[in-house]
Amino acid sequence: MSQVIYITAHPLDEMVSNSMAVGKAFIESYQESHPDDEVIHIDLFKDEVPEIDADVFSGWGKLQNGETLTEVEQHKVSRLTEIVDQFVSADKYVIATPMWNLSFPPAVKRYFDAVSVAGKSFKYTSEGPQGLLTDKTALHIQSRGGFYSEGPAAEVEMGDRYIRTIFSFLGVPKYKLIAVEGHNKVPERAEEIKLNAIQQAESFAKEF
């Protein structure tokens, strides 16, 4: 049995959001073809993912020195530990995001900051950082109103570029993007674009 972490990063549901609609279709198809696998849903607009702030840095320092943490420090540090432990124990990752201002909602960066932990998801070596998640697989479902797969616009697409890079940094060897793109550029084809992406997602789910 495999464990899948399904991460969503949109404040609206699948009735409005293309990334959420395609993500939902993927997960439903995946569960149908992998009935014994466990899917854990993380909603980055609802679930608590602490910022790495002054409390966290203070708490980490106190842990190293054997000092007592404040209640706030303990809560944030413990929650961050739960998040990274959950992340590294999973076998597969699915993340559905919209493109916001060439990138993604800030909650996505906060989550990857939480799970990028030396000694857990990567390690430092004499040759530089080395990812530890070498037996994992990742899928990114990204909705973007324009066309960013090729041409000049591809150079300014920072969302999938970052997610692909951070998964590689953490050692994940298998990565795929399903892009739902162009629905704002050619609104008359918006429904067709979404349905094509849903079909692609449902098909890929069977082999994921």
Curated annotation (Swiss-Prot):
The keyword NAD applies. Binds 1 FMN per subunit. FMN binds at S17, N18, S19, M99, W100, N101, L102, S143, R144, G145, G146. It catalyses: 2 a quinone + NADH + H(+) = 2 a 1,4-benzosemiquinone + NAD(+); N,N-dimethyl-1,4-phenylenediamine + anthranilate + 2 NAD(+) = 2-(4-dimethylaminophenyl)diazenylbenzoate + 2 NADH + 2 H(+). Its EC number is 1.6.5.-, 1.7.1.17. Keywords: Flavoprotein, FMN, NAD, Oxidoreductase. Its cofactor is FMN. One of its GO terms (molecular function) is FMN binding. It comes from the Bacteria. Belongs to the azoreductase type 1 family. Homodimer. HAMAP family: Azoreductase_type1. Quinone reductase that provides resistance to thiol-specific stress caused by electrophilic quinones. PANTHER family: FMN-DEPENDENT NADH-AZOREDUCTASE 1, FMN-DEPENDENT NADH:QUINONE OXIDOREDUCTASE. This is FMN-dependent NADH:quinone oxidoreductase. It comes from Staphylococcus carnosus (strain TM300).
